Design a protein with these regions (language model features):
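Short N-terminal or domain-adjacent regulatory/targeting segments
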Residues: 1-33, 43
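Glycine-rich, highly charged phosphate/nucleotide-binding loops
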Residues: 16-21, 86-104
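Histidine-anchored nucleotide/phosphate-binding helix
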Residues: 42-61, 65
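An aromatic- and histidine-rich active-site surface loop
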Residues: 119-132
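Structural motif
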Residues: 112-115
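Active-site-proximal region of nucleotide-activated glycan assembly enzymes
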Residues: 146-179
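Short internal beta-strands
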Residues: 62-70, 138-139
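Active-site proximal beta-strand in glycosyltransferases
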Residues: 135-145
Length: 179
């Protein structure tokens, strides 16, 4: 019963904050600003971050990287990312909605490309994907309501789902093919 009520309020919040910016495929030559969301819990996230930054510099793009960090940190553990660009579990409200004020650049400023490297269907990433103002959206998990213009997922016979760097390479290769 509680899940039904939560879903009702989540849908209302999605409708309220959903991006009204038309999206679609955009050639790399028309892309100037990129927002990338990386899951800190995935193995090799720091290497993926470096790959994204190198690609952005090489292509002359302004890249903003945001992090999902839903780990339970112990007393001795420290946050490995900048606090202003990191979405923490304690930063969610009772519905699981991220604080819109914390990630204002993602929700209010229009960007040309959003790349979500988070490979799960949890509500916080659904909210972020549907509400981010980007002209072209790429993600790893499909959501009801077409949150992304392009969904890149691994083949069922390979372990591509766990290799974010290979997925990112595939996304870069695809972006080069759009004319």
């Amino acid at each position: 019963m509680f899940e039904v009520i939560k879903r009702f309020f989540r849908d209302r919040k999605l409708r309220k904050f959903a991006s009204d910016l038309p999206t679609g495929f955009i050639p790399l030559s028309e892309i100037h600003t990129v927002n990338v969301v990386i899951n800190v819990e995935e193995a090799g996230f720091d290497l993926l971050k470096e790959d994204v930054l190198l690609w952005g510099r090489a292509a002359g793009l302004k890249v903003n990287i945001y992090f999902f960090d839903f780990r339970k940190l112990g007393k001795d553990e420290i946050l490995m990312t900048t606090i202003d660009k990191t979405l923490l579990r304690k930063g969610l409200d009772w519905l699981g909605t991220p604080n819109v004020n914390k990630l204002t650049s993602l929700f209010e400023e229009k960007s040309d490309l959003l790349i979500s490297m988070v490979d799960n269907g949890d509500y916080p990433i659904e909210f972020l994907s549907k509400c981010a103002k980007a002209r072209f959206k790429v993600g790893r998990h499909a959501f009801k309501g077409h949150a992304y213009d392009l969904v890149v997922s691994g083949a069922s016979n390979e372990d591509l789902r766990s290799d974010s760097r290979r997925i990112f390479q595939e996304i870069k290769d695809f972006l080069l093919k759009i004319k």
